[in-house]
């Protein structure tokens, strides 16, 4: 029997509180998660160089919590916490990969330990699973370490996952944003056609390495005399912001913005 989770994240708690409304009032939910970005590296947080106009506008329209902390500052444990509402000491996913100290990478034992890590998610009801009980369709894009998107309870998604080749932490999901937003557009149109509320997990692989931003963005930061490595990172932060603007445009063009919570 899965443990019923207690949502401790302020965002998830806030979202679940909205579900006391009638079915007709269920909001769509968009969960935006940047990757390897310092909390200071946004215009609305006062960064002197990085431009994030789309998120700045969103921040002006939103409640902003400026003091957030994570006990396990790694990608996979943090995403597992967002999906389950439990900290790493509860869900058991405390690292990105099995330790090579105990099994050689690529060995059968290593793969067994990796499968064991993925299975830890089975202890809990995930946020997409809870939303599905309330009639939501859900879509995964971007980073996802826990196997196929279906393993997280998403009804739709991009990540094929373990044990398929290339399924370590996102495979096809890592293309979102960097190579366009078409999978999200198709999903939103599908949800609208089905007359279902939807949940979007937008875990875009930005501004994470590789720092290969469009030249038009990189040029802006190189002209400020910044070291090239810094200029590339700053440009990737702005690139992330651009994709968030594209995501919001998808909602606005379909008249969905007023019926959507963006976290």
State where each predicted segment sits:
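Positively charged n-region of N-terminal signal peptides that target proteins for export
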Residues: 1-5
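Formylglycine-dependent sulfatase
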Residues: 8-12, 19-263
